[in-house]
Amino acid sequence: MITPKVLSGFKDRLPKDAIQKAQLLAKVSVVFQSFGFVPIETPHLEYAEALLPDASSDIQKEIYRFKDHGDRDVALRFDLTVPLARFVSLHHQILGMPFKRYAIGNVFRGERAQKGRYREFTQCDFDFIGSESLVCDAEIIQVIIASLKALDLEDFCVSINHRKILNGICEYFGVSQVNEALRIVDKLEKIGLDGVGEELKKECDLNSNTIKELLEMVQIKQNDLSHAEFFEKIAYLKDYNENLKKGIQDLERLYQLLGDLQISQNLYKIDFSIARGLGYYTGIVYETTLNDMKSLGSVCSGGRYDHLTKNFSKENLQGVGASIGIDRLIVALSEMQLLDERSTQAKVLIACMHEEYFSYANRLAESLRQSGIFSEVYPEAQKIKKPFSYANHKGHEFVAVIGEEEFKSETLSLKNMHSGMQLNCLSFLKALEIIGENDEDL
């Protein structure tokens, strides 16, 4: 006999968990659609050559790669952005540019399993393809903020940086292995200053003084300074080189656009340590953390990539986008008690006291559904205790009881499972009025 078990880093979703996830995805999808983003789908499995060029060395170690039955070198996607590059290159003439898309799907990384981190997890990506305008970058940040607010989150911060600033810092300190250095800097939160310093010394052959000064610069943060105060503080960096000058100018323009959108300044700050480990980022980058749960890591991250299709097409298409980590958000929202704890989406359970009442019960359930009330019929004629126990376990708000009197008079008795109050022999319209008082729970 096979012992039922799940691989480490993977998980089953019980009904309650699956409902919570579906509700979150529905909410963020509405936000995406409200900004004009349209859905697409790409396969879980791609040719390995399509995925590997843009993966950092760390992520390449985590990719699930194998030979399929046709002896082809294939891999499970590790994010939704690289498949997007292949998708856009294949279909760009049909899509038209600029193109705004969102995609929701599972991705796979063989990283160490821990709280809020899985080897299979769901990403919600939204991207603006085919425009180099910073208006697009500002809109992506606007969508991040709107999405988190749609999930009833208010206390978070989008930490923003620019890859040109990081490139400029590396240039200033004479770092030749820029991508490798930035990959290491991106691990600052995970391994700390000492760990980053050791790796920079080992992998990039930097001396201790250079490492010390470089790390001091990448730790520059806006913190509680106003936008104007911060840009005044870092203005001297524009004189160091063109990369730093261009990066800071782009951030100044971005902040002007975000200000025009009247987004609260508490929700976004500049942080020079934000690097994003994926090698395809070229411009503004960002990571979003919940202020009271920073140990969970970024719940939404992304940035600009100006060479999206370079591996697939001579026609260069740039883009900017972000990815919401739904699984991490579920962990956070659960701890904050902001999730629906029911194991059913049906608001009403209809219970029959006798077999012959099922035809009436089914008609009643269908009438409720047509009125927008999710309903189900308990499948067995039982003493009332068993359906009530079932409703308590699943989380139905109401139980409609059909006994002899209700059957004959074509009424129903209705019990509120939260308050315990029961009203007998109600007309359908009266019951509908009572049930519909809390439609936001549907």
UniProtKB/Swiss-Prot annotation:
It is found in: Cytoplasm. CDD domains: HisRS-like_core, HisRS_anticodon. One of its GO terms (molecular function) is histidine-tRNA ligase activity. Its EC number is 6.1.1.21. It catalyses: tRNA(His) + L-histidine + ATP = L-histidyl-tRNA(His) + AMP + diphosphate + H(+). Disulfide bonds: none annotated. It comes from the Bacteria. Its main location: cytoplasm. GO terms for cellular component: cytoplasm. It is an enzyme of class 6 (ligase). Keywords: Aminoacyl-tRNA synthetase, ATP-binding, Cytoplasm, Ligase, Nucleotide-binding, Protein biosynthesis. One of its GO terms (biological process) is histidyl-tRNA aminoacylation. Coiled coil: none annotated. HAMAP family: His_tRNA_synth. Homodimer. Belongs to the class-II aminoacyl-tRNA synthetase family. This is Histidine--tRNA ligase. It comes from Helicobacter pylori (strain G27). The lineage of its organism: Bacteria, Pseudomonadati, Campylobacterota, Epsilonproteobacteria, Campylobacterales.
